[in-house]
């Protein structure tokens, strides 16, 4: 509701929210079969009379795994501020209705980094014939665009990249480099993670929701242990988080 109110109060505000195409069209928990998140977006759009405005919610048909399993991380760009978190924007994480779930947040204020992420969204996601509005009643069925989805994923895996002249330097202790990777072959993100394993001097700390590492990483961990390096693995626990 807050997003729609903000758009209603300030029509010139640019709002684009990208969500998993498949998950957004599943049934809401405990709701009848016809009710999905996408249906709710349409209802809210009609409620706040935004019919003539650009769409706010878009579905991205990518549901694949990264090197450490499914990476449930969310990215937000507010003007020149980038916010990364494992949390969703919902009542539980915002401590509404007497419930609160803790998560981690990284807040980075840097105009070039924010611009590079917005440019990536515009160039590689919104500029596609399969990243479609979810707050529209005229949504195609997934099977109708399946061939286009395969082409989209292949093209994104081959060409997707952030356009930033150099890493964002925040002093001696922190440098931020946006990397994109999709799929198994030539995945820059996965390759970079594996290469970092080779640079450990004393200790490696891994934060991961899963413990089933790919075989290549298992081999690298064994190699580090044989060389006497310390390895700390922090595994997410749902009960503890809740």
Predicted segment positions?
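Charged, low-complexity intrinsically disordered terminal segments
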Residues: 1-40, 50-53, 57, 61-74, ...
């Amino acid at each position: 509701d807050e997003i729609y109110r903000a758009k209603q109060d300030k029509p010139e505000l640019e709002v684009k929210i990208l969500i998993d195409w498949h998950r957004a069209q599943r049934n809401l928990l405990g709701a009848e079969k016809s009710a999905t998140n996408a249906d709710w977006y349409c209802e809210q759009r009609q409620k706040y009379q935004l019919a003539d405005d650009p769409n706010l919610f878009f579905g991205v048909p990518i549901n694949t795994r990264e090197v450490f399993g499914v990476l449930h991380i969310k990215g937000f760009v507010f003007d020149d501020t980038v916010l990364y978190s494992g949390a969703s924007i919902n009542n539980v994480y915002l401590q509404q209705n007497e419930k609160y779930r803790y998560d981690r947040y990284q807040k980075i204020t840097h105009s070039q980094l924010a611009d590079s992420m917005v440019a990536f969204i515009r160039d590689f996601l919104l500029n596609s014939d399969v990243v479609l509005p979810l707050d529209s009643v005229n949504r195609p069925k997934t099977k109708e665009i399946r061939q286009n989805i395969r082409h989209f994923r292949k093209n994104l895996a081959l060409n997707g990249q952030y356009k930033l002249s150099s890493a964002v330097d925040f002093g001696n202790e922190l440098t931020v480099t946006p990397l994109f990777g999709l799929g198994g072959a030539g995945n820059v993100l996965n390759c970079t993670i594996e290469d970092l394993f080779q640079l450990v001097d004393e200790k490696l700390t891994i934060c991961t929701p899963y413990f089933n590492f790919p075989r290549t990483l298992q081999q690298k961990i064994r190699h580090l242990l044989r060389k006497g390096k310390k390895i700390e693995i922090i595994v997410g626990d749902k009960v503890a988080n809740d």
